[in-house]
Amino acid sequence: MGKRIAIIGGGNLGTAIAEGLLKSKFSKAAEIIITKRNISTLKSLKEKGIEITDNNNDAVKKSNVIILAVKPFQVEEVLNGIKKDLNTEKILISVVTGGLINEMEEIVKKNMAYFRAMPNTAIAIQQSMTCICSKDADPATIKYVNDLFSTVGKVVTIDEKLMEAATILAACGTAYAMRYIRANIQGGIEIGFDASTASLIAAQTVKGAAELLLQKGSHPEQEIDKVTTPKGCTIAGLNEMEHQGFSSSLIRGIVASYKKIAKD
């Protein structure tokens, strides 16, 4: 039997993680416990064999891995409530936005493996980009946590000092990509497509472009060169976008988001 996993917080993120663990067969239903105050909303998970409870302490006692998936303002209260049930044999993973590892340590006061993981909303369809950092974790534990989050998408290990930047590029980045797709759809409608067809073409084109980079490991400019011809329509469109500040506005937006999160 694998490690028992307690997901503290049965909101959208917590339930998405549970679903990913099940669909990938990383964990059996009997190895997952998920907690929430209102457990009636977790009926579908219960029907799949996952244990649901409103008792955080009971879940932690039964588990080897604890995934903290609560709201940021709840972290201190929840950690204070479960810290007596944590020990050096357990793994604590926070998927809460913000909150440094040393802040968790100061509350828990246990010599154990600590992790922060930053998934994005595509975790709901097992296509997240998750950035992970850790402290006091051995290589085997780091591999285990990476494998766990690989069930819901791609994983990269980073230094904790880059977690805010990861939030911008991976989490906020979803919104940036959606805004590009929305503009693409609007342009498609203007040149003749109905909204439904334009949406499909725009979304699939972006998905295909991303897969080219992921599967081939090529640079974006290499793929751009393949669809641009002298005096062609692609280069005319790209040049007009750049004249209007396409790349610079995106870069400035990313930096503005980072300055905001760093300031707060």
Protein language model annotation of sequence segments:
Residues 39, 45-48, 56-132:
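Rossmann-like NAD(P)(H) cofactor-binding subdomain of soluble oxidoreductases
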Residues 5, 114, 163-168, 220-225:
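Short pre-catalytic strand/loop immediately N-terminal to key active-site residues, enriched for Gly-Thr
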Residues 103-113, 129-165, 178-215, 260:
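Internal alpha-helical scaffold of NAD(P)-dependent oxidoreductase catalytic cores
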Residues 28-31, 88-90, 196:
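Short acidic capping loops at alpha-helix termini that bridge into adjacent secondary structure
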Residues 1-54, 58-61, 127-128, 189-190:
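NAD(P)+-binding Rossmann beta1-loop-alpha1 motif at the extreme N-terminus of oxidoreductases
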Residues 32, 59, 75, 194-201, ...:
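Small-residue helix-packing motif on alpha-helices
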Residues 203-264:
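NAD(P)-dependent Rossmann-like dehydrogenase/reductase catalytic/cofactor-binding core
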